[in-house]
UniProtKB/Swiss-Prot annotation:
Monomer. Its EC number is 3.5.2.6. It catalyses: a beta-lactam + H2O = a substituted beta-amino acid. Pfam families: Beta-lactamase (PF00144). This is Beta-lactamase. A beta-lactam binds at residues 90, 146, 177, 179, 370. Transmembrane segments: none annotated. The active site is at residues 90, 177. GO terms for cellular component: outer membrane-bounded periplasmic space. The class C beta-lactamase family has a specific amino-acid numbering system known as SANC, for structural alignment-based numbering of class C beta-lactamases, or else the simpler name structural position. A multiple sequence alignment was used to derive a consensus sequence and then the consensus was numbered taking into account insertions and deletions. This allows use of identical numbers, e.g. for active site residues, despite differences in protein length. PROSITE patterns: BETA_LACTAMASE_C. It is found in: Periplasm. The lineage of its organism: Bacteria, Pseudomonadati, Pseudomonadota, Gammaproteobacteria, Pseudomonadales. It comes from Pseudomonas aeruginosa (strain ATCC 15692 / DSM 22644 / CIP 104116 / JCM 14847 / LMG 12228 / 1C / PRS 101 / PAO1).
Length: 397
């Protein structure tokens, strides 16, 4: 395990990113080559986007490597470490999918169940004709990116919103990325298991995955590790409460813990069988939009893929605009030479996670500023492709 901690060298030229795709310097130690590769990918992006602090964690053939840059808080001067807690925004959806995968493999629900089967309050609404799979994969018919401002974190208001909602498209026909969609999926998964979502995550999911630095509500004892997020105007920001926030974007975690989650996804067989099956259930693709195959929480691409196409799959239009889907004839295993990824943001934080099962390779990038997805993907792509060019990631046999 390697933990490299140092300040952001903000004077470094953006052109040094090219180092990430050049051969290693002869005689340089492997750890130094990896550090140089990550430095060259990260530092220009930090400078260009005025990112106070950033953490990278890489799983390379089962070995974790950590790289920490800058400040967790500009106010008190705390530096980023692998244990610093970041808000991960929509990367939380992959944890929600894991809980749902557990409910599926325990036969508490099926993806073709109607949503109203698991919440009687929705009976008689449009959710009589919307499946759990539609909710999980953003194809319910046009649920929006966010709840309206008028809907607060109140079950009655949330229920009333869903009861009156009317679809714009036929369920199962168009993808429109949506917190209310996958949020309801997570809520219904918890209902099928007979416990509140938050309790299931904190008491079952996180412990089963070996995560001790992952929280929905950061406990007082861990507050000193919680990074301060920063908005576009450099104002300190942290995520506030919202409807189905835990299900959609509520997880706070460290680079070290999130890498453990990535490792669990790379090697589900190392977990207890119910949780191995739960993770496997999230690694199934149901339809394509362009190059992207939609799984449960995860979005997948054939690997290798060009940087431009990977950025397009994680672009603003993919998040904000509807896209007609191409349904797969049967669920497709997202394994082998595929890159599974997820972006996540809150107003003050930006996250990106990616892994390639067939290369036994994964990485985590966490920052305390919400900066463009294209920049996060650029960092990851430089590291992943650089490692391949250095011959670090042969095919997993």
């Amino acid at each position: 395990m390697r933990d490299t901690r140092f300040p952001c060298l903000c004077g470094i030229a953006a052109s040094t990113l090219l180092f990430a795709t050049t051969p290693a310097i002869a005689g340089e130690a492997p750890a130094d080559r990896l550090k140089a590769l990550v430095d060259a990918a990260v530092q220009p992006v930090m400078k260009a986007n005025d990112i106070p602090g950033l953490a990278v964690a890489i799983s390379l053939k089962g070995e974790p490597h950590y790289f920490s840059y800058g400040l967790a808080s500009k106010e008190d001067g705390r530096r980023v470490t692998p244990e610093t807690l970041f808000e991960i925004g929509s990367v939380s959806k992959t944890f929600t999918a894991t809980l749902a995968g557990y409910a599926l493999t325990q036969d508490k629900m099926r993806l073709d169940d109607r949503a109203s089967q698991h919440w009687p309050a929705l009976q008689g609404s449009r959710f009589d004709g919307i499946s759990l799979l539609d909710l999980a994969t953003y194809t319910a018919g046009g649920l929006p990116l966010q709840f309206p401002d008028s809907v607060q974190k109140d079950q009655a208001q949330i229920r009333d919103y869903y009861r009156q909602w009317q679809p714009t498209y036929a369920p199962g026909s168009q993808r429109l990325y949506s917190n209310p969609s996958i949020g309801l999926f997570g809520y219904l998964a918890a209902r099928s298991l007979g416990q509140p979502f938050e309790r299931l995550m904190e008491q079952q999911v996180f412990p089963a995955l070996g995560l001790e630095q992952t929280h929905l509500d950061v406990p007082e004892a861990a507050l000193a590790q919680y990074a301060q997020g920063y908005g576009k105007d450099d104002r300190p920001l942290r995520v506030g409460p919202g409807p189905l926030d835990a299900e959609g974007y509520g997880v706070k975690t460290s680079a070290a813990d999130l890498l453990r989650f990535v490792d669990a996804n790379l090697h589900p067989e190392r977990l207890d069988r119910p949780w191995a099956q739960a993770l496997d259930a999230t690694h199934r693709g149901y339809y394509k939009v362009g190059d992207m195959t939609q799984g449960l929480g995860w979005e997948a691409y054939d690997w290798p893929i060009s940087l431009k196409r990977l950025q397009a799959g994680n672009s603003t239009p993919m998040a904000l605009q509807p896209h007609r889907i191409a349904r797969l004839p049967a669920p497709q295993a997202l394994e082998g030479q595929r890159l599974l990824n997820k972006t996540g943001s809150t107003n003050g934080f930006g996250a990106y996670v990616a892994f390639v099962p067939g290369r036994d390779l994964g990485l985590v990038i966490l920052a305390n500023r919400n900066y463009p997805n294209a920049e996060r993907v650029k960092i990851a792509y430089a590291i992943l492709s650089g490692l391949e060019q250095q011959g670090k990631v042969p095919l997993k046999r």
